[in-house]
Amino acid sequence: MKLAMGIYDAPEKQAQPVFYLEPLKNNVAVFGGPMSGKTTFIKTLLVRLHQREQIPNESIYIIDFSGNMGEYSKLPNVCACFDNSNEENVKRVFKAVEAQLAKNVRLLKGQSFVGCEFKNQKTDIRHIIFIIENFNSFLADERYDSYQEVLMKLCRDGLSKGLTVVFTANDCSGISRWLPNFRQKIAFDMPKEGYMEIFGSKVGDLMKLPGRGYLNVNESVYEFQAFLPFVKEEHASLSKIMKQFKGKTNANRLVAFDEELSIQNYGAYSASSKSYEDDSLVLGDDSVIIGLDYYEHQPVAINFDESRSLAIYGKRQFGKTNVLRLIRNEIKKKHGKEYRFLISG
């Protein structure tokens, strides 16, 4: 997989070759000050991943500490895009990434992911891209301290199993120990001492342009100009990509529970995107769906043919009666005059 992301100056060749990013082979670190082009680079990456003629099994997870992803978070292969306002959502992203990685390991059976890349398009092996926008904020937030060692392991061991980690950062504060796991480094406009820490060599003065920076091609450092996501008007071009995938659903997409879950809005949060009634038909008359799994959005159901009794515990005003009422209504709807005893109190 090679993605055209910009051009770089190669004076020894007297040329300006196209820079192709190879996310299957490298984790990617993107640095730069405010308005330097970091987020635009990530948007271009997302677009390039969706512009290939054959889209492989791909799952993209984004923790967006900058809050700038906007409409790009709705691209079809984006499975999650959460900000840092709710720790539970960040936990869900990590859990989803780890679960898919474990599935890859099981299916690869000791092979390297790159060595068997998409030979069978029907396989459940997926390429996972895990993006953290504003890595400095992630590292500085005490709520996420426990995730740092998990992330370090993902950075160190993930590539051979189909996981690529990408982050953006304003500077190198607290990031030095992470850099050995990121072979591809890109640095837009920032203080000169930052380039030395990132690349280990001095660089010249940059032209002050958004998207202008430095990157490494193998071990050499070159001046670089990043491409924009689209040549023409951004919104129209993004809409065109969305239309190409119209009718296709992403069964792995995670959404935030930003309202109370009900039978009416069930389909908006279910992994299957099916209505409550449709999922109930699949499970049969003896089962009652009482909600969705918080992490995978799969139906949580009680089979009353197998479970002859049920105890519901919880604090006052935390939903016990609502669950009981739902069960009663569904039993009445499915079984009519058949009696089941429900005791509340």
Describe the predicted segments one by one.
Residues 1-6, 175-289, 300:
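Phosphate-binding and hydrolysis-coupling loops of NTP-dependent motor/remodeling domains
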Residues 2-110, 119-185, 189-191, 276-345:
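P-loop NTPase catalytic phosphate-binding loop
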Residues 113-128, 259-268:
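Amphipathic alpha-helical surface "interface" segments used
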